Amino acid sequence: MSIREWFEDRRKITGLLKNSVERDSKDVNEMERNKNLSIDYVKINRLWVQCDNCESLLYIRFLRENKSVCEECGYYLQMNSSDRIELLIDRGTRHPMDEDMYTLDVLQFHSENEPAHSDPLHSEDESYKDHITFCQIETGLTDAIQTGIGQLNGLPIALGVMDFKFMGGSMGSVVGEKITRLIERATEESLPVIMVCASGGARMQEGSFSSMQMAKIASALYIPQKDNRLLYVSILTSPTTGGVTASFGMLGDIIIAEPKAYIAFAGKIVIDQTLGQKVIEDFQVTEHLFGHGLFDLIVPRNLLKCVLSELFYVLQSSS
């Protein structure tokens, strides 16, 4: 090999290396750009929410100030239990109850030997225990309800608030026990009970243990209500369905519903298939049900605290 040929070979190798380095640099830069875009998307996702009805982008800070009601179309977005408590309870007056109570997988729903999945919410095979753990991490709650004692415009009350973000607000053993204890304490201390319902119904992973909570809560309410020792106000939000609707959701001395809330026992598709005929649209929406006498009041979210305090003052003065 001559010296000229050797230099030509070195030039070719150098050119190939240079092209390879340039391609690698472009790939790295592209990855960095995609990473930045991903970070920006996460930041944006924490600052903005899209309305489920009109698809408008809503700034979270303003949305919370507006009680999670869309500024564009007036649609009621879901509120978590902590925001509901902040809406109703005077600041600094709340004393939570049974925060350390958590669910046990008594039925061992799905074997622990089955393969795990990365996203429990999108896997029907995920164990119940893993699903509960996932929801606890996501929401910061031990189960689908928060209970406690507090003051509403200076009036002491007992409050239970269900959280739909925790397994669809489903009612299991812990939810039933916490509600029962809240009712018993309210009866002992002569406090009115407010229950904010947001649930898909009984929790299927607990089988009959879940269904039993319907009877247990109804029994806890029956005697105090019959003897006029307990005022129970049920607030139905969207969605309230299944076993919750069939039990304590509809047992209130006063039943209040939010505007345009979805309230039902069985879903529309199930009813269509069972009856073999089409049912009318929006027959499970607040306004239609109110027209047929299922509720006492429809109260906008921003007026709820004032309306409740007025009701309690009137009832206390008349008793």
Curated annotation (Swiss-Prot):
InterPro entries in alphabetical order: AcCoA_carboxyl_beta (IPR034733), Acetyl_CoA_COase_Trfase_b_su (IPR000438), ClpP/crotonase-like_dom_sf (IPR029045), COA_CT_N (IPR011762)
Zinc finger (C4-type) stretch: 51-73
Subcellular location: Plastid, Chloroplast stroma
CoA carboxyltransferase N-terminal domain residues: 47-319
Residues binding Zn(2+), per UniProt: C51, C54, C70, C73
One GO CC term, this protein: acetyl-CoA carboxylase complex
Enzyme class: transferase
UniProt cofactor note: Binds 1 zinc ion per subunit.
Keyword line: ATP-binding, Chloroplast, Fatty acid biosynthesis, Fatty acid metabolism, Lipid biosynthesis, Lipid metabolism, Metal-binding, Nucleotide-binding, Plastid, Transferase, Zinc, Zinc-finger
Catalytic activity: N(6)-carboxybiotinyl-L-lysyl-[protein] + acetyl-CoA = N(6)-biotinyl-L-lysyl-[protein] + malonyl-CoA
EC number(s) recorded for this UniProt protein: 2.1.3.15
Pathway: Lipid metabolism; malonyl-CoA biosynthesis; malonyl-CoA from acetyl-CoA: step 1/1
GO biological process, one term: fatty acid biosynthetic process
Domain of life: Eukaryota
Family named by the database record: Belongs to the AccD/PCCB family.
Assembly notes: Acetyl-CoA carboxylase is a heterohexamer composed of biotin carboxyl carrier protein, biotin carboxylase and 2 subunits each of ACCase subunit alpha and ACCase plastid-coded subunit beta (accD).
Task performed by this protein: Component of the acetyl coenzyme A carboxylase (ACC) complex. Biotin carboxylase (BC) catalyzes the carboxylation of biotin on its carrier protein (BCCP) and then the CO(2) group is transferred by the transcarboxylase to acetyl-CoA to form malonyl-CoA.
Name used for this protein in its record: Acetyl-coenzyme A carboxylase carboxyl transferase subunit beta, chloroplastic
Species in which this protein is naturally found: Picea abies (Norway spruce)
Name of the encoding gene: accD
